[in-house]
Amino acid sequence: MNTIYIKQGETHELVEQVATIGFFDGVHRGHQFLISRVIDEAERSGMASAVITFDRHPRQVLQADYQPELLSTLDEKLLLLSKTHIDNSFVLHFDASLAALSAHDFMQEVLCKQLNVKKLIIGYDNRFGHNRSETFEDYVQYGKEMGIEVIRADAFLTNDEKVSSSVIRNDLRAGNIEAANRLLGYPYTIESRIVSGYQNGRKMGFPTANLDVNACQQLFPASGVYAVMVRLRDSVGWKRGMMNIGHRPTFNGTTTSIEVNLFNFTGDLYGQELLVSFISKIRDEHKFDSLEALAQQLKQDKEQINRLFDETYHIQENIINTP
């Protein structure tokens, strides 16, 4: 896949493109379905296939106080897109100038003049342009003026439910990891930097890597204990682990912390980038009467997680299929 970063007014020598456009947060199964339609149409038409996306969430420009809760970082999104076998990913720099373009002007200046799009396949509910005020019929009419065929793709349904990033976020907020992963088509994965913590886990025999909550723009699932797979950004192998998200009530914590215990691992991780893939929620976070009671529960959690990997998911270390 070619990744091409685009700014307004730049010119590029490009072959004719069959494209789709969107933010594609998480590149979930609905997105994958849409992209497969683009690839099929490109092959039939003898053109290149393309995804047009943005370098930041549009609401980060349109709303100054907007705090994104993303399913995927830009780097992860591009990696996921590359796995669809799309030819090109065009990453538009989203700023106030781009946001001000009407759908007509966007199609004329960006799709037609810059990207040489000849066929545009849009999602069943996708709208673009300033204030997203135009309709699919408007896009079709504009396309006729510019030599762009505009096609609406069907919705992708699973169990009679439309797959969307919003539904996935709601599942994650509720701790429904398996449901979210089914809609994504892969285990939900976050990335953040490892920072120093309180060392409470180490004292109980369960040393943890603490993630920098503020450095991560991705959505954190509901508070609780999770079965996870973990790897360092620059490594290959995945390790089993258990993660706690919450306020550490046994220690009277008041702020959110995210910490993960890596199974069968020793070493210094501080300052490194860690990827965590969520497999299943094990239990809610509880306040225990003593450190001994908490340590005993953590031992049981670890045993349950290992059984889950062995007997239910049949996942071994180093083979999990994630971004």
What spans do the regions from the language model cover?
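N-terminal catalytic cores of NTP/NDP-binding nucleotidyl/phosphoryl-transfer enzymes
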Residues: 10-73
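Short acidic-hydrophobic, aromatic-tinged amphipathic segments that line or gate anion-handling sites
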Residues: 2-9, 90
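Phosphate/ribose-recognition catalytic cores of enzymes acting on nucleotide-derived substrates
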Residues: 197-323
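Glycine-rich, highly charged phosphate/nucleotide-binding loops
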Residues: 69-77, 101-107
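A glycine-rich helix N-cap at a beta->alpha junction
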Residues: 73-89
